[in-house]
Amino acid sequence: MADLEEQLSDEEKVRIAAKFIIHAPPGEFNEVFNDVRLLLNNDNLLREGAAHAFAQYNLDQFTPVKIEGYEDQVLITEHGDLGNGKFLDPKNRICFKFDHLRKEATDPRPYEAENAVESWRTSVETALRAYVKEHYPNGVCTVYGKKIDGQQTIIACIESHQFQAKNFWNGRWRSEWKFTITPSTAQVVGILKIQVHYYEDGNVQLVSHKDIQDSLTVSNEVQTAKEFIKIVEAAENEYQTAISENYQTMSDTTFKALRRQLPVTRTKIDWNKILSYKIGKEMQNA
């Protein structure tokens, strides 16, 4: 092991550390960071060399953050990235600095949004917040309005998580929806992601995603927002149901075909007593 350490350059060590961090399960960033920190044993190298990994993790995970003085949380996403560590809160029309390691927001300041698409963005946000409140107990959403290739585009992001470290599991739902404001009909594109980590008496991860495409009738802002939410709700309900049914089927068939839940004797073995069983048998035969 010592020989291997000597063979690895600092650049290679940081690259490996960054991969561990980027792939940390939901809610386990700090644990992975602390483990990597011990392995690397060089805080300056880790902070400087793996800073991009901290940022990438938060962007990928749609990390929610609370800004002091404002009621609602906002998501850290690529769509709100203003560069130089600053992010956009489109609802409150502010920008703020975000520390990717501490996951803290500071220095909120007024920020002018793109007025041409703001009325559409606000309508979609209002409808989406009502939907998220109904379907996600811990859900957070952020809606962006921006011009992409000259076209007015709405981007809606949803994040919901449950971190149950005491019960040995953590999970996160993420979804991202986009549509361009065009006359008559627009194409809606979405991606849904689920990631769950269960680690009691084992180590199991569920990582799943689904791409969605649909058509949206574009009329006025309010009606278009309602129709958009109908598409979101139908797709996310279908995805959740399919995941649940699929893993129930796997539990009932595939997993049972691969391995018996109970031994052939249909009796569970108490492994803590297995040694005493053997000793007792030997004493009887003595």
UniProtKB/Swiss-Prot annotation:
GO MF term list: actin filament binding
The keyword Acetylation is assigned to this record: yes
Pfam families recorded: F-actin_cap_A
Entry-linked InterPro entries: CapZ_alpha, CapZ_alpha/beta, CapZ_alpha/beta_2, CapZ_alpha_1, F-actin_cap_asu_CS
Residues carrying N-acetylalanine: A2
GO BP term, example: actin cytoskeleton organization
Modified residues (Phosphoserine): S9
Keyword Acetylation part of the UniProt annotation: yes
UniProt entry keywords in alphabetical sequence: Acetylation, Actin capping, Actin-binding, Phosphoprotein
Gene Ontology cellular-component terms listed: brush border; cortical cytoskeleton; F-actin capping protein complex; membrane
Family the UniProt entry places it in: Belongs to the F-actin-capping protein alpha subunit family.
Biological function: F-actin-capping proteins bind in a Ca(2+)-independent manner to the fast growing ends of actin filaments (barbed end) thereby blocking the exchange of subunits at these ends. Unlike other capping proteins (such as gelsolin and severin), these proteins do not sever actin filaments.
Quaternary structure and partners: Component of the F-actin capping complex, composed of a heterodimer of an alpha and a beta subunit. Component of the WASH complex, composed of F-actin-capping protein subunit alpha (CAPZA1, CAPZA2 or CAPZA3), F-actin-capping protein subunit beta (CAPZB), WASHC1, WASHC2, WASHC3, WASHC4 and WASHC5. Interacts with RCSD1/CAPZIP. Directly interacts with CRACD; this interaction decreases binding to actin.
Annotated protein name in UniProt: F-actin-capping protein subunit alpha-2
